[in-house]
Each structure stands twice: as structure tokens, then as C-alpha cells.
């Protein structure tokens, strides 16, 4: 139990709240305004144009000329879901729907009003404020074009008292710990005890721990968690190892991605777990004892230029990989520790959600990392040895094994090289190693496997592994380490390999030893090949340039990570200061250049830098952001500075620079394009097929396999060409048509050791930027960048999203052919309607499929014995080993375990080897075939095998079949009709369950046959008929010669196999009797219900489904066709209503709520099947009540039911912040919530549904004998049964205090149409409150506002209908508007009035006139007062009796979420309530 302050028992608590509200009081804890002033994320919004600050005044908003930072009504902060919260009003800024067609109301609204009108983009907020508050709007750029110059489109508005724009104080997700929300982020603000909290709070807790709710309203959902805090101790929530002084936090109950887990640890001043010693591994294993879990640790391979590393910068010297790990390092870049393998490590896909372990050292939460020592004390060395920092070094050019190299070093008085810092690595790389490709160093794990140590016995404090290394540490042949490549990266290698080596030994201290100055002036510090000096005066940028020039030098330039490390060491002791560099964007183009004009080849930006503004000069930060680069105002910001003076010829050779500059005259490969002014060629990889889209790391791999890189952009000119290329391919239509069409580019911040700094994957310096000025709550986990086709700007994105991408290759470079070997280059071999190519070179399954797609092919599918024999004959010719495995296209996904072919064709043929396939599990499976036996097996997809590609002119994908004809006729009693077929389920009595052939015979006796299922619609009908079936059912699908077919040889066009199926006994290659037959599963597992499985035809008995055609002599059943829109539909315990209108997701929700419903919840496969019939019958996708929060891929139901059953299409959900719909094939897909679909499904509530979109005021009850329906800001009364003339309609609505219907936008028209459509039989239409104004020559509504939206039906509105004698109406069947005469015709009536406060509906004479009634009222009042007094007395007594009797919160490491979740369910459980339960 998590204890808290006392809570009242339910009835006195609610009564007391009523009493206090009546008395003008409220329960709660007022915020501490003094503390709020210190909040760094709170700000005032200042208007440059109006010279004032934005202030909340009640429900209104105004600009006041007096800015007051202590006034809560002027204090704002960004909160969850891109909302703007006011501390004084404790509400969110929003817009209401227009009361007239010309005004939109800007005001303060309750933050739980789930509407897009509360969400703002910081980049456009200023423009919208100017527009809505009546000021002159900022000039906006033309849509679809690139912006140049200053990107600050909100320049009229900024944060008061600074030059910061409105994007400068963003909101970041805060991940909870413990509680009952599985680590889900806080929802800010949240409501607790009828009070809004805009941050974490200790309210309600006696122990003072900060907590937050993870849904909007704690009182309703009771979902919560503790907030992360940075502290210098390890008291609450941490386990401490007394031996090492390290602290550990095990978050077993959380489920986060690796990057989310890393962010959660960072928010506590910690990092993900690193394990650097055997003792530490043993200690962790002890804490894991008794638990069953897989947890994230800090091990990662996210640096595309480096190898495995710890996220906290610890050296990677101890390893505990499980056998065969790491595998697939190209795509699975994050490490886990597993209890099942006694603490063994595996690498996983970083995007999956898992528990995690944090680690920290006490008193080390904000200390900057100690820099390397760069001073060079003068020492004496023997001839041929070179000095550096007190040691001597020598290259041994003779190639020897590692052991022989070590002995040679020992003979010289030294040992093999040990490296302890970036400074030492730079010296070795630049001066000793030089042009030698690979050399031995002293690192090895010869003494103890997986534990690397230096041969000279020194401590391993620094590692610098090569990409994908260390990788073969398990193999005893790879126990020794080499240094190789221009950056000096390390690789583990066999110790018997013959290589040169480097020796190291201590130098002899010279007499009067002093630091070498290499000719630098006094006070200057040398670092090859320059002298450096710190200017201690704080000056603006131009003065810093002048002062360096006066000293015969320039402001410092930084060209590689070694120079960066050196400069950071110079400024280490200057806490809180900034130092100018030579980097600047003086022309405000968004492109940074060194003052020398040199290209920027290395960058080291701080978080959120270089920001959104154009222009500025770059300074180095200090403190916890030591050495990181930030953009500052060149003319107003004051900083210290660093001068650099070159000594001319470098004392030591320079490091190799970036790749040579490509030629302008080189040609581009076929299919690649360029511009005469650019040195690279470009290619867009885009596909409509979701399977061919890639994650960021997959897209990078594809580009690199071609010898190219993911797109990097160094200038506006280069990006302008890319934009032109995209417009040429996809068209220059309005941005809306390109919405959410994104392309991966090479920009990323995946590497945790770089903090949150953006880098190009090809090593190009990040010197040009074009980020869209948008913010997302989860920006911490958006580690990769995309180019947005709509805005042609960049947007951060989660790296695992599957998208298109763009590659870039230097001019004159040929696209690299895949290394496919000699036999792989054979011509394509034709068989029947397809061509096949056999590749003998070995690849993983995914890489093999990727190579096939380069030839417009897929890994082969197999659909007949003849095709299998053809493949087997060719494989026997190519395979020296007849048992060789070859990849084919059959595979499963991790999400559901169902087999599918890569080309989308159906599974109608199997050839499994005995014992295959293996039972389904969580891992993806891929299928191979053997050469001699021609049988299939499954194994891990990362295994490298040869493979077969197949291509054909006809697509293998089966298209959804058209609806069968709805033939006349019906079905006999006991049969269920659907379209033109009759179905009957048999086997309810166990004695009626028979073998397959007996089932077919039984059907034939009834003039029927076993069912054939031709499409998803028929499958949905059958699945929807299964809720009460408790046994499996034979269908007409069977296999006699390995290929499945229907009875009567009907073509097999559709299959619905269960996960891991078909896997039954493989039919014999020859024979006529069926040996494998299919059943429909009744399984209690939702993922198997209604799916197919293959069973032995002769050994098993089951129920069965018979099918026959309808009888023309019988009447059709009412349920014979798919559901139609409009009417209410009942299924099981649910009631639905189908909408068939063009709707956005929010519009659909509004429309459902106007029908006392909400968007539908799909709890099980039966309901899913029923809704599939609806979508298939309407031939249109339908919105459902499933959506994700802004910027998140976590999807949840509007009803807040758990997401236990899903029916996602492959690779879904795709969209962050998207909404879900049921497609015509029954699967769920996601898209932007602003997409217009042609329909939706409402789930009708038994009681009033919870309204997700709330508006001020309410509608009258029974006013003017009418029922009023709320919709947005208005109320509507529909009287289609009353047919009146236009004049009478006006009078009727005026009597009710409203007006005849006006329609101001498309959504309102859809709402009205939806309600008129159900009353089409009563009236053909309803009057519109519109007339012609001859003075202005325009149509106006009753309030004389112009008609700006219209929906005229053909042929439109002619001039003859624009007269005062014309009246206008809306047609019930179509929603179209029609003109007509005002007299002699009658229509239905729809009245409309604005919502008003509830007490506005009370009659003015509120007191009863009857004396008897008056006595009753007075008696009730006296009774209420007596109850109020009793409640107050009871409250005070219980409060004093229970105060102080609670235990403090405990840190719980539960191995099962169930008990802990029950314990942590409600933070408001008190001892009083427990005592009451015991009584």
C-alpha cells in the first residue's frame, strides 16, 4: 500500500464537497506561487507589435501593456500534447468553434477538452495570436517552398525579458517510476482532488514524494507513478553496492523502449546500467535472483562510426554475451540482460518495450566529465623511441604474433601499447601508427574469457572499438586486440595473426623538466600544430575577433574530435562561462562556416542546437555541457574567447581528412540525378508497399550496400535541388496532399555518448540546418530526422518508423553491385509464368530479400509440386552439399507468428521437413528449402544462406474480391443466410463430430458441401457466428498432393491461416486421398479464433460447416447482407451505428457523441469480424475509437479499455500521433487523424457516454417541447415530423429562442445531414435560415452574416434564384442545398441556438408560488443544513483520529506486475478505508 494523507469515507467526503462548494469553498492545495517563479519552463508571452504580455482574464485572453512576472495570469508553460497552460487560470489556451462565420473565439478552456483546438505548434503560435487578437499577421511563406533567411515566423511574439522565441522553453516527457502505469510519462496538467496540477506534486502524500498522474483525470482512472528526481543520495528507489558505492534501480514494472529508458535514467541523474567488472556482474545477478525478466542495459552500438559501448562512457572491457550473441548487429543495436541466462547479455531491436536498470554514483549527478590530460612533460627516450606525456613509444614494423610482439617489447624494457585517453590515442594515430593499416596493442582477454585487460597491468579506463566490435570474443582464437583504420578504432582478432605492433615504456625525467612549449609564447598552450590562448575578458563577438587579431592569431577552429577534447580541457575549470569560436552564420542562411571560409567537417552541438533561428555565432559551453557548441547573438551576448595561432608546418602529421572532394564533371549512375553545380548524385527510394519501407538503420544499410550514404545536406543550394527532385517525382500540389510523407535523411542523434547532438551519418559536419519549428513531447526519443515533403523542412522522428528514404553518392562512383559470386550472375531461368535467379553467396534473410528487390523481384514463393521440383533440380546442380539450405520467401513477423510469402501470394502449398516448423515464439522466423529433399525448415533469419529470387509480370498479391451477387432467395430453417449462400454449423452434440470425409458425406446428404471461403467478408460472417461454438470445425479445404484446394476444385483465392500454420503432417507427393484437411479454430486465444489450421483428415474428429446456395423459392433473411449505414446494429452485448460520410477522426467522434455514442471499441475477434462485414459491405475504411497520443506510437481506446486484442495489418501501427481505422480487409491501419475517410463506426452507450470533446455551457432540457442535441458550440432541435412553410419555421424557432438552421462549415453540414438522413421518410429536407440581401447582393444568414460556406447541389445556384422570393433548404438524402419557393411548399424544421450556462435555462420566478411547495422547500433546506453540520463534525473527528498513522513509501522490485499493480492501484488508499473494510 502506498500511504497518504487521510481520506474521508465515501459518503461524508462527497457530502462535504457539496457543502463546501455551496459555501464558495473547495478542497485542495493552492500552488506555491513563490516556488513557481523559479520554474525554468514558465514564461511570459510578449507581443512586439502590441507592446504587452498575454494574460488570461477569466475565460478570455487579452494583451496587457503591464508585464508582471509574479502575476500567475501572465505565466504560461508548454504541457503535454502541445498545449499551453496558464498558471493563473489553471486552464489551457484554445479556440472555440465560431459563433458566427467570421469570428473564432480565443480563450481559456479546461485542459481535458480533448480537441485539436487546444493544441498549438510553437512555430505558428505567434502568427495565430496576432490573427486571433486582431493584430497584423506575420508574413507567411508560400506553402511548399523552402524558407530562406530568418525562420522566426513568430517574430512578433517572444518570451518576455529575453530574445528567446516561443519554442525556446519546450515540454519534455517525464517518465514515471513505480506506481501502476508501467513507466508511462506523466500527463501534464492532470486533475487530482478537483484541482489541476501543472507539474509533479507531493499533495496527498505524507512522505513528501513527488508523483503525477499518467492520464488526464486521476480521480477517474487512478493511473499514476512517482516522478524522477536528481539527488545526490541513493535512498528511495535505489539498491546500493557498499563495496563499489554504485547504486542500482530495477524498473521491473516499466515497459519502455531503450531510448525512453535511457531518458528515464537521465532524468534521475543516472544512466542505464553499465557492467565493467566481474564483481559487478555477480552483484547484479544476486539482485536478479528470483525474477524472470529481460531488461535494458546501457550497452549499445548506436554510433554508426564506432563499436559497442556503454551509454555512461564507461570502458567496454568486460563482456557477458550469451552464445551466438550479438547477432544481426546492423539492426539490433541495444543490449539487454536476461534472468533466464543468469545475467547473460543479448542484443535486441532498440524500439521494443522492456523493463530496465539504472545506475548512478552518489554525489555525481552534475559533475562534468574530467577531461584528458594534454600537458606534455619533457622526458628522455632511447633512440628510435618517441616521447609523449611521460612515456616513450616505438613502432615495431616486423610482423609477429601477439605473444611474439609482447616478448619483443619486453626485451626492449617495455610492453605492448596501452591507451588511456583520447589525447594518447591522437598521438598514437598521428605520430606512431601513421600509414600502417593495422597493429597489435596490449589489450587481451587471455587470462579470463570476456574480461579484457592491458598486458602491462594498467587499468582499462578507455576503449575505442571499431563498428560491430568486439564481436568474436567467445572464440578462443580472438583474444587479442588490434588498432586499425584512420581513427584508430580497435578490433579483437586471433592472437596468432602476424602484424606490426607498438611498444610503450616509462620515460626518464629530464633535468629541470618542464612542459614543452614548442615555440608558443608565455601563457599560450601548445597542441600540434598550433598555440592556444584563453581570453578572459567577456566581450561581444566582433571584439573577440579583433582581440585575437591583435595577438597575431584567429578565433579557434575545431576540425576533429581530438582537437575538441583538447579545447575542452583548456576550459574545464571555467564553470558557467562561454567561449567564442570562429564558427558563425553571419549571413543568416542557416549555413555555418568558419571565419577562414573552410567547410565544417566536424561539429559538437549541445542539445537542441543550433536551434531554429537563422544567424548567430557559436560559443563553447562549460560545466555539465563541457565543450558543447551553442549559438549566441553575435552583437549582444558577451563571452570569453579562445585564440589559435598556427605555427606553420605541423610538428606531427595530420590525421587523414574526410573523403576526397568529388569531381563536378563525374557522371551519375543510371537512375540517379544531380545538378551541374553539385558534386553528388541522388536517388529517392519510395514505395507504396509497406513491406519495402525501412527503419532509419535499415535505410542506412541499403544506401551503404550501394556504395552510397543516406542523404546529408551541406547548403541551401543542395537542399533546393533535392526539393526540386521531389516535386518532380511527386508533384507540386498543396502541402496537405503530401502530409506525413517523410523521407529518411542521414541526420541522427542516436549515439548516447554524444548527448543529444545531431550528426550526419556520413561524417559531414552538421553546419546547415532546416528544422521545422515544431516540438514534440517525446523529442528525447526522436533520434533520427526526416525530410517532410509537405513543408520541405526537417522533422525529428523515432528511428524505428518504416519510411521512404533518399541516398547520395559521389559523382563518378559506380553503384556497388551486390557481392553475389560467380553463380549468382547467371541469367534468369524461366519456368511457367515466372523467372528465377539463384544466388550462391550467403546473406541473411532480410539482406537476401533486399537484393531481390533490386531486380524487381522477391524471395521465391512456391505454389505447386512442379514448381518445387523445378527449384530442387536447379539447387542440386548448384549445391556441392546436397543438404545445403537456401532461403525462400516464407516468413513470420514478430507481431503475430503467421506465415506469409514476401510477394503477398497466398499459402496453398507446403513441404515441411519432419519436425518442422518449430513451435511459434516471439522471434521472427524465416524458411529455407534443401536441395536434395526439397523440404522446408525454419531458423533464425540472421543466418547467412544462399537464396532464390523470383519475379513475374503478374503480382502475386491477391486483391480483395468483389462482393458476391446478392441473389434472390432464402435458406431453409436451421440455416443462416449470407448474401447468396446458406451456412449451417454442425457438431454441437459431441456424437456428431466426425472425420473430414464423413463431414463431407453428411453435407452431401443435405444437398450441400463443406464450406468454401472465398474472401474476407465470408470469413468475417463465419467468425462472427462462433461466439458460442466450443469446438473446431472442418471446412472444404484439403491437400492430397501437398497443394491445398477446395472441394469441387474451386480456385483458392483467400486464406486465413493461424500463427505457425499450415504445419500439419505434410501430404505425400503422390496420392489422391486427402491427408491434410483444414479446420476453423474456436480457440479461446483471440489471435487464433476463426483462423485455419491443417489437421489429419483421417485421425481427428471435429464439427463442420455445410454450405449451399440460396433457394429462389424462399424469402431472403433480413440479415443476409452486410450492415447498412444509419440504423442501429446489435451484436452480442454491443450496439453500433455506421456512419458513411467524409469525416476526419475528430469529426467522427463529434458525430458519434451527437448520437449518444462514441467511436467503437473492438474487444475481441468476434466483434472485429462483425465490423469487418460493415467495412467490406460499405467498401470503405471506417474510423474506430483507437488513437495514439500526440507524437506517440502508443495506441489506446477512447473507452480506456486495455488493448488486449489487436488486428493490425503487417508493420502497423505506423503513425506517431495517428488514428486507427478498420480497412475493407478487416485489418487495422493507421493514418493522420486529419485524413478524411468515408465512414466510421460508433459504439452506442447504454447511458450517457463520456464526452471526450467538451464545450462550455449545455443545451436546454425540454425547452419549447423539444429535445436539443449538442454539437460543438450549439444546440439543435430536429422536427422532421412537423412540415411547415418557411415563415412558420422562422416563428417556431424564434419562439424557442433560436434561429432556423444555419450551416457554417463542412463538418456542421455532415452533422445535420447525418441526422436528417434517418428521417428521410418523414421529410425530403429541412429549411435553411438563409435569405437574399439585395443591398449587398449576397446570401446572408438570419443574423445578417454572409454565407461563406455552401454545399449547393447540381446545377448550382443560378441568378434567378437570388431574390427575396427565394428560400433555401437542405436535402435529407444527400446533404446538398437546394433553392426553392418560400410558399406552397413545406419542409421539416431544425432550430439552432448557442449553448449557454445551465442556470440560464431557469425561469425567472425561481421560488414556488404554492405555500405547500414553499414548506417542502424550506424543510429540505433545514435538513440539508443539519447534514452539513454532521458531515463537518464527522470529518474533523476522523481527521484528528487518523493523522500520522501511515507507513512511508517503499521501493518495490516485484517480479510480477500483478500484485504490485494491485498494491499500487490507488494512491489514495488510507488506513481509515482499510479499517472500514475490515469492519
Curated annotation (Swiss-Prot):
Q: Where is this region: Disordered?
A: 1446-1479
Sites carrying sugar chains: 101, 139, 363, 1028, 1348
Upper lineage is:
Eukaryota, Metazoa, Chordata, Craniata, Vertebrata
Keyword Repeat: yes or no? yes
Extracellular compartment segments: 31-1413
Quote the SMART domains the UniProt record gives.
CLECT (SM00034), FN2 (SM00059), RICIN (SM00458)
Q: What is the protein named? A: C-type mannose receptor 2
Q: Where is the C-type lectin domain?
A: 243-359, 388-504, 527-643, 677-808, 831-950, 978-1106, 1131-1242, 1271-1391
Q: Which GO terms describe its cellular component?
A: cell surface; plasma membrane
Please name the gene that encodes this protein.
Mrc2
Name the residues that span the membrane: 1414-1434
Annotated tissue distribution: Highly expressed in heart, lung and kidney, but little or no expression in brain, thymus or adult liver. Expressed at highly endothelialized sites such as those in choroid plexus and kidney glomerulai as well as in chondrocytes in cartilaginous regions of the embryo.
Q: Does the keyword Transcription apply?
A: no
Amino acid at each position: 500500500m502506498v500511504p497518504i494523507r487521510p481520506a474521508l469515507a465515501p459518503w461524508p467526503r462527497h457530502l462535504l464537497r457539496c457543502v463546501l462548494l455551496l459555501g464558495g469553498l473547495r478542497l485542495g492545495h493552492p500552488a506555491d506561487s513563490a516556488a513557481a517563479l523559479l520554474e525554468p519552463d514558465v514564461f511570459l508571452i510578449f507581443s512586439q507589435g502590441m507592446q504587452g504580455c498575454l494574460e488570461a482574464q477569466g475565460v478570455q485572453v487579452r494583451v496587457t501593456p503591464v508585464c508582471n512576472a509574479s502575476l500567475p495570469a501572465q505565466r504560461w508553460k508548454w504541457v503535454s500534447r502541445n498545449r499551453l497552460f496558464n498558471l493563473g487560470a489553471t486552464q489551457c489556451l484554445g479556440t472555440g468553434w465560431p459563433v458566427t462565420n467570421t469570428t473564432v473565439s480565443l480563450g481559456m478552456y479546461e485542459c481535458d477538452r480533448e480537441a485539436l483546438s487546444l493544441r498549438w505548434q510553437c512555430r505558428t503560435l505567434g502568427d495565430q495570436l496576432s490573427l486571433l487578437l486582431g493584430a497584423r499577421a506575420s508574413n507567411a511563406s508560400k506553402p511548399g517552398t523552402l524558407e530562406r533567411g530568418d525562420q522566426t515566423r513568430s517574430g512578433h511574439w517572444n518570451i518576455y525579458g529575453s530574445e528567446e522565441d516561443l519554442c525556446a522553453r519546450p515540454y519534455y516527457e517525464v517518465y514515471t517510476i513505480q506506481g501502476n502505469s508501467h513507466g508511462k510519462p506523466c500527463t501534464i496538467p492532470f486533475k487530482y482532488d478537483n484541482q489541476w496540477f501543472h507539474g509533479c506534486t507531493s499533495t496527498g502524500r505524507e512522505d513528501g514524494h513527488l508523483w503525477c498522474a499518467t492520464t488526464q483525470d486521476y480521480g477517474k482512472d487512478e493511473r499514476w507513478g512517482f516522478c524522477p528526481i536528481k539527488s545526490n543520495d541513493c535512498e528511495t528507489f535505489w539498491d546500493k553496492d557498499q563495496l563499489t558505492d554504485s547504486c542500482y534501480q530495477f524498473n521491473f514494472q516499466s515497459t519502455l523502449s531503450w531510448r525512453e529508458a535511457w531518458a528515464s535514467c537521465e532524468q534521475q541523474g543516472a544512466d542505464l546500467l553499465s557492467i565493467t567488472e566481474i564483481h559487478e556482474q555477480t552483484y547484479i545477478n544476486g539482485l536478479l535472483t528470483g525474477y524472470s525478466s529481460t531488461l535494458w542495459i546501457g550497452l549499445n552500438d548506436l554510433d554508426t562510426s564506432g563499436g559497442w559501448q556503454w551509454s555512461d562512457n564507461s570502458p567496454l572491457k568486460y563482456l557477458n554475451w550469451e552464445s551466438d550473441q550479438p547477432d544481426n548487429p546492423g539492426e539490433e543495436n541495444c543490449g539487454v540482460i536476461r534472468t533466464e541466462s543468469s545475467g547473460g547479455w543479448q542484443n535486441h531491436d532498440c524500439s521494443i518495450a522492456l523493463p530496465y536498470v539504472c545506475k548512478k554514483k552518489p554525489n555525481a549527478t552534475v559533475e562534468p566529465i574530467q577531461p584528458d590530460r594534454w600537458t606534455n612533460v619533457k622526458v628522455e627516450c632511447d633512440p628510435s623511441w618517441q616521447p609523449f606525456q611521460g612515456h616513450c613509444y616505438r613502432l615495431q614494423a616486423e610482423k609477429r604474433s601477439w605473444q611474439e610482439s609482447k616478448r619483443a617489447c619486453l626485451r626492449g624494457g617495455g610492453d605492448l601499447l596501452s591507451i588511456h585517453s583520447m589525447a594518447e590515442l591522437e598521438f598514437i594515430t598521428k605520430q606512431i601508427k601513421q600509414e600502417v593499416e593495422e597493429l597489435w596493442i596490449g589489450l587481451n582477454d587471455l587470462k579470463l574469457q570476456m574480461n579484457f585487460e592491458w598486458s602491462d597491468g594498467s587499468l582499462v579506463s578507455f576503449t575505442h572499438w571499431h563498428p560491430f566490435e568486439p564481436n568474436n570474443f567467445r572464440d578462443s582464437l580472438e583474444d587479442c586486440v588490434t588498432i586499425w583504420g584512420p581513427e584508430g578504432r580497435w578490433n579483437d582478432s586471433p592472437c596468432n595473426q602476424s602484424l606490426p605492433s607498438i611498444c610503450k615504456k616509462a620515460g626518464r625525467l629530464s633535468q629541470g623538466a618542464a612542459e614543452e612549449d614548442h615555440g608558443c609564447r608565455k601563457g599560450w598552450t601548445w597542441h600540434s600544430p598550433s598555440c592556444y590562448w584563453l581570453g578572459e575578458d567577456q566581450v561581444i563577438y566582433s571584439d573577440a575577433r579583433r582581440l585575437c587579431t591583435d595577438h597575431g592569431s584567429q578565433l579557434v577552429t575545431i576540425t576533429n574530435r581530438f582537437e575538441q577534447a583538447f579545447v575542452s580541457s583548456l576550459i574545464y575549470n571555467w564553470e558557467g562561462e562561454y567561449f567564442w569560436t570562429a564558427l558563425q552564420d553571419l549571413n543568416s542562411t542557416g549555413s555555418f562556416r568558419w571565419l577562414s571560409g573552410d567547410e565544417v567537417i566536424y561539429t559538437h552541438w549541445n542539445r537542441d542546437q543550433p536551434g531554429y533561428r537563422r544567424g548567430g555565432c557559436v560559443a563553447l559551453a562549460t560545466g555539465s555541457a563541457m565543450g558543447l557548441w551553442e549559438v549566441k547573438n553575435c552583437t549582444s551576448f558577451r563571452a570569453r574567447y579562445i585564440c589559435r595561432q598556427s605555427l606553420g608546418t605541423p610538428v606531427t602529421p595530420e590525421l587523414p581528412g574526410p573523403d576526397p572532394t568529388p569531381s563536378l564533371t563525374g557522371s551519375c549512375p543510371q537512375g540517379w540525378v544531380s545538378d551541374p553545380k553539385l558534386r553528388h548524385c541522388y536517388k529517392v527510394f519510395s514505395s507504396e508497399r509497406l513491406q519495402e519501407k525501412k527503419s532509419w538503420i535499415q535505410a542506412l544499410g541499403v544506401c551503404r550496400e550501394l556504395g552510397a550514404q543516406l542523404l546529408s545536406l551541406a547548403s541551401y543550394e543542395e537542399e533546393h535541388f533535392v526539393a526540386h527532385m521531389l516535386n518532380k517525382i511527386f508533384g507540386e500540389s498543396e502541402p496537405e496532399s503530401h502530409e506525413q510523407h517523410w523521407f529518411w535523411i542521414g541526420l541522427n542523434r542516436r549515439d548516447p555518448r554524444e548527448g543529444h547532438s545531431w550528426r550526419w551519418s556520413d561524417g559531414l559536419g552538421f553546419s546547415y540546418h532546416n528544422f521545422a519549428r515544431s516540438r514534440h513531447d517525446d523529442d528525447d526519443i526522436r533520434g533520427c530526422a526526416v525530410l517532410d515533403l509537405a513543408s520541405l523542412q526537417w522533422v525529428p522522428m523515432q528511428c524505428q518508423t518504416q519510411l521512404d528514404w533518399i541516398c547520395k553518392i559521389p559523382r563518378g562512383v559506380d553503384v556497388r553491385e551486390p557481392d553475389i559470386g560467380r553463380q549468382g550472375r547467371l541469367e534468369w531461368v524461366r519456368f511457367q509464368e515466372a523467372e528465377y535467379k539463384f544466388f550462391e553467396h550467403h546473406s541473411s534473410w532480410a539482406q537476401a530479400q533486399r537484393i531481390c528487390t533490386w531486380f524487381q523481384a522477391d524471395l521465391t514463393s512456391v505454389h505447386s509440386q512442379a514448381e518445387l521440383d523445378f527449384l530442387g533440380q536447379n539447387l542440386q546442380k548448384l549445391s556441392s552439399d546436397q543438404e545445403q539450405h537456401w532461403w525462400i520467401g516464407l516468413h513470420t513477423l514478430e507481431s503475430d507468428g503467421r506465415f506469409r510469402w514476401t510477394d503477398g501470394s497466398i499459402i496453398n502449398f507446403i513441404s515441411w521437413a519432419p519436425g518442422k516448423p518449430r513451435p511459434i515464439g516471439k522471434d521472427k522466423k524465416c524458411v529455407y528449402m534443401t536441395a536434395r529433399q526439397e523440404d522446408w525448415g525454419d531458423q533464425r533469419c540472421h543466418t547467412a544462406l544462399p537464396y532464390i529470387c523470383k519475379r513475374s509480370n503478374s503480382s502475386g498479391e491477391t486483391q480483395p474480391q468483389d462482393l458476391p451477387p446478392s441473389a434472390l432467395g432464402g435458406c431453409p430453417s436451421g440455416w443462416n443466410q449470407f448474401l447468396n449462400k446458406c451456412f449451417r454449423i454442425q457438431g454441437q452434440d459431441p456424437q456428431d463430430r466426425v472425420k473430414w470425409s464423413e463431414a463431407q458425406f453428411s453435407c452431401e446428404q443435405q444437398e450441400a458441401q463443406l464450406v468454401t471461403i472465398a474472401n474476407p467478408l465470408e470469413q468475417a460472417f463465419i467468425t462472427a457466428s462462433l461466439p458460442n461454438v466450443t469446438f473446431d470445425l472442418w471446412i472444404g479445404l484439403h491437400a492430397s498432393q501437398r497443394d491445398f484446394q477446395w472441394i469441387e476444385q474451386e480456385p483458392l483465392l483467400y486464406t486465413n491461416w493461424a500463427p505457425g500454420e499450415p504445419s500439419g503432417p505434410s501430404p505425400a507427393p503422390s496420392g489422391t486421398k486427402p491427408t491434410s484437411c483444414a479446420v476453423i479454430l474456436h480457440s479461446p486465444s483471440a489471435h487464433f479464433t476463426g483462423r485455419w489450421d491443417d489437421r489429419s483428415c483421417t485421425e481427428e474428429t471435429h464439427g463442420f460447416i455445410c454450405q449451399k446456395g440460396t433457394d429462389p423459392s424462399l424469402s431472403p433473411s433480413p440479415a443476409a447482407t452486410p450492415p447498412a449505414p444509419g440504423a442501429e446494429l446489435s451484436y452480442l452485448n454491443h450496439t453500433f451505428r455506421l456512419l458513411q460520410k467524409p469525416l476526419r477522426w475528430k469529426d467522427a467522434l463529434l458525430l458519434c457523441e451527437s448520437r449518444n455514442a462514441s467511436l467503437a471499441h473492438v474487444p475481441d475477434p468476434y466483434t472485429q469480424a462483425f465490423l469487418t462485414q460493415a467495412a467490406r459491405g460499405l467498401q470503405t475504411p471506417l474510423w474506430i475509437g483507437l488513437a495514439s497520443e500526440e507524437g506517440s506510437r502508443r495506441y489506446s481506446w477512447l473507452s480506456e479499455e486495455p488493448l488486449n486484442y489487436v488486428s493490425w495489418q503487417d508493420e502497423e501501427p505506423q503513425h506517431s500521433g495517428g488514428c486507427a481505422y478498420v480497412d475493407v480487409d478487416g485489418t487495422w491501419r493507421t493514418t493522420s487523424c486529419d485524413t478524411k475517410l468515408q465512414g466510421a463506426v460508433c459504439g452506442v452507450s447504454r447511458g450517457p457516454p463520456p464526452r471526450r470533446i467538451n464545450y462550455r455551457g449545455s443545451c436546454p432540457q425540454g425547452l419549447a417541447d423539444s429535445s436539443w442535441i449538442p454539437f460543438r458550440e450549439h444546440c439543435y432541435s430536429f422536427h422532421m415530423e412537423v412540415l411547415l412553410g418557411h415563415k412558420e419555421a422562422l416563428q417556431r424557432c424564434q419562439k424557442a429562442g433560436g434561429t432556423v438552421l444555419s450551416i457554417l462549415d463542412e463538418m456542421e453540414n455532415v452533422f445535420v445531414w447525418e441526422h436528417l438522413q434517418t428521417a428521410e421518410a418523414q421529410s425530403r429536407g429541412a429549411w435553411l435560415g438563409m435569405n437574399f440581401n439585395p443591398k449587398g447582393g449576397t446570401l446572408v444568414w438570419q443574423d445578417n452574416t454572409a454565407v461563406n460556406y455552401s454545399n449547393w447541389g447540381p446545377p448550382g445556384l443560378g441568378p434567378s434564384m437570388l431574390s427575396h422570393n427565394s428560400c433555401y433548404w437542405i436535402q435529407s438524402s444527400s446533404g446538398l442545398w437546394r433553392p426553392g419557393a418560400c410558399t406552397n411548399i413545406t419542409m421539416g424544421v431544425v432550430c439552432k441556438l448557442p449553448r449557454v450556462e445551465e442556470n440560464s435555462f431557469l425561469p425567472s420566478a425561481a421560488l414556488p408560488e404554492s405555500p405547500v411547495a414553499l414548506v417542502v422547500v424550506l424543510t429540505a433546506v433545514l435538513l440539508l443544513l443539519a447534514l452539513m453540520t454532521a458531515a463537518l463534525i464527522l470529518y474533523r473527528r476522523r481527521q484528528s483520529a487518523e493523522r500520522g498513522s501511515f507507513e512511508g513509501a517503499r521501493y518495490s522490485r516485484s517480479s510480477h506486475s500483478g500484485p504490485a499493480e494491485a498494491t499500487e492501484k490507488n494512491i489514495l488508499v488510507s488506513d481509515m478505508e482499510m479499517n472500514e473494510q475490515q469492519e
